[in-house]
């Protein structure tokens, strides 16, 4: 039997001065603020983790990387994502593609979108689409208080053959 599933994930982190900015597997050293979190606060990686876990029924980011676990304190978002990818593929799932949208006034993603897609695709092992938007200065993201991300993932299990990818 072939299983095809989708999952959705979201994440939000507060912005604060004196914290490094990491989003979509990239560092933004010129930013004067960064995302506060138990790990590096990478909202894109965290949303993708939740989308993959949701699609496969393996829980959520909080159940895998609880804030009480010191092993993940300060961990890079791509490290968390790599761990989730290993869990997902270890259960026989093939990740077909992922899409993630970063919502906030900063960091500006346009100039580094291709770089972010490449970094995330390398970790995920499947195509990743990255987009970004603002809320036209509305809400907490618009006021510069935080950044959010929304992700979707498509996974399959049970495809036979050398190449189990549906995406060409």
Curated annotation (Swiss-Prot):
Family matches, as InterPro entries: MECDP_synthase (IPR003526), MECDP_synthase_CS (IPR020555), MECDP_synthase_sf (IPR036571)
Record-listed E.C. numbers: 4.6.1.12
Record PROSITE patterns: ISPF
GO MF annotation, one: 2-C-methyl-D-erythritol 2,4-cyclodiphosphate synthase activity
Keyword Cell wall biogenesis/degradation: no
Site positions for Transition state stabilizer: 38, 134
Protein name: 2-C-methyl-D-erythritol 2,4-cyclodiphosphate synthase
Organism field: Cutibacterium acnes (strain DSM 16379 / KPA171202) (Propionibacterium acnes)
